[in-house]
């Protein structure tokens, strides 16, 4: 069954398409694997417009990575994804794993399928902040270097959902937010909010920046985020790219900063890959 989404998610997918097409072009002949965590069924339906569209998995498959590995959340999603990805398969280049990304054994299965000679790109788009843990990010980075020591590139859709903002000041939610960040430094943001020293906009900014600091502390040369062009105000997420190359940062900003129409809108025009 297609995943039900809102128009802001459609906007996110259009931005992702521009990003992943441009990113794949800079690979040229380099061997690189695409790893999709928290993968869904492969297609989605917009609640606002009742139109169907490809999800991120099929959009990525239209680019030129050497291998694609998707971690589906459950068996129905895995079966749907297997059916929809079949036309794109060449030389056994698509693999689908079923499991929870927070489990060590799932991460091991994922990287067992990645050749040591290949670099990797990981797309992390969790179904809410409770689904993402800092420990998982660290495991991915630890497993993800190629034989030359090149660190894995990460594109993280950081969830700035209302649930995170509401739960920030709830004692019973401290454990889940601490798992997201891997530390308790976020409590300083919480206290500043409770003391009335910062508003909601600054809370959002500091939550994103704190996550970026953690990625920088893991050794990445470039960690950047961008607030999506005003489609949802405030935005429900921030894309964050962690890479040792500055090229990907420019691609991120180009993809998410430009105004755009959606497929359901009259002036929409699909850009073709160069």
Regions found by a protein language model. Give the residues of each.
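Conserved beta strand-loop-helix elements of the APE1-like EEP
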Residues: 214, 239-248
